[in-house]
Regions:
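Class I SAM-dependent methyltransferase SAM/SAH-binding core
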Residues: 57-102
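A short acidic, Gly/Pro-enriched loop at the edge of an enzyme's catalytic core
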Residues: 104-111
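A conserved beta-strand element that flanks and buttresses the S-adenosyl-L-methionine
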Residues: 113-115
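A short glycine-rich, Lys/Arg-flanked "PGG" loop and its adjoining helix->strand segment in the class I
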Residues: 129-141
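SAM-dependent methyltransferase
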Residues: 146-216
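C-terminal lobe and adjacent flexible extensions of AdoMet/dcAdoMet transferase-like proteins
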Residues: 210-257
């Protein structure tokens, strides 16, 4: 899987990717997907401020800010932030350019959140642990860190094979290729236009089991408060394909740096 090591995040999330990222009303921008996400995050933020790691083009941050939640972002990709700026200005949603595992945003927050599998964009366990610790540093006592993440789909992987199709619909195929030794997966997104021309987007990830994620949280001083299969509170079971996990920094406890 040399492809993982050869793909830098700055190169993946470039101007072309940023300009084609939004799919208004469809996919992860569909109201039935985005609505429950924003509802739950607004509930968790309460009257406090929220910080989004990997804010991107503002898919979640913009509607959350429209709910009256003050939102700040951290984002590695300048082109993604440029797309965000076509929707809101810096005064409405300020953004710090930097790595979510280490960059610092000013102030203290009631909520830090990281959605749509994005913690897996960090390709080492050490970086993922650092991301938890960075979230803890930004939180007020009793604050929460929310992660949305897929459950590794290894049960679908045929013995002796490295690839599995995880989604297929007219005009789109999603395919994952696995490196089991390094816990790496490359997601391949093939989109076909009406003429049959294909556009390929690939992104490397380090997949994380829920138990490993919980240990990362404990290393940073968090306690797992809840875990559900989705944003509307469906029970998390052995058959769940993803989870929304809420970690809480207990009052009186400081982050483990």
């Amino acid at each position: 899987m040399a492809i993982v090591g050869s793909m830098r995040q700055e190169e993946i999330w470039n101007t072309e990717t940023a300009q084609n990222y939004d799919t208004p009303g469809a996919g992860m921008f569909a109201p039935e997907v985005l609505g429950p996400t924003v509802d739950r995050l607004a509930e968790l933020a309460g009257d406090g401020r929220a910080l989004e790691f990997a804010i991107g083009t503002g898919r979640v941050a913009v509607p959350l800010a429209e709910r009256g939640v003050p939102v700040t972002g951290i984002e590695l990709s300048r082109p993604m932030v440029e797309q965000l700026r076509t929707k809101v200005d810096e005064a409405t949603i300020p953004v710090v350019i930097g790595d979510m595992a280490s960059a610092t945003a000013p102030g203290e927050y009631a909520l830090v959140y990281l959605v749509y599998n994005t913690i897996s964009n960090l390709l080492t366990q050490a970086e993922q642990v650092a991301c938890f610790r960075n979230a803890a540093r930004h939180l007020a006592p009793g604050g929460r860190f929310v992660i949305e993440l897929r459950v590794p789909g290894l049960r679908k992987l045929p013995p002796g094979q490295e690839a599995v199709v995880w989604h297929q619909e007219p005009g789109y195929i999603g395919l994952d290729t696995y490196d089991l030794l390094r816990q790496h997966v490359v997601s391949h997104h093939l989109r076909f236009d009406e003429s049959g021309q294909a556009r390929l987007f690939r992104s490397p990830h380090r997949y994380i089991w829920p138990a490993e994620l919980d240990l990362m949280g404990r290393l940073a001083g968090f306690e797992l408060e809840s875990r559900h299969a989705d944003w509307i509170g469906t029970e998390f079971t052995a058959e769940s394909r993803s989870h929304v996990s809420v970690y809480r920094m207990p009052p009186g406890r400081t982050s483990s740096r």
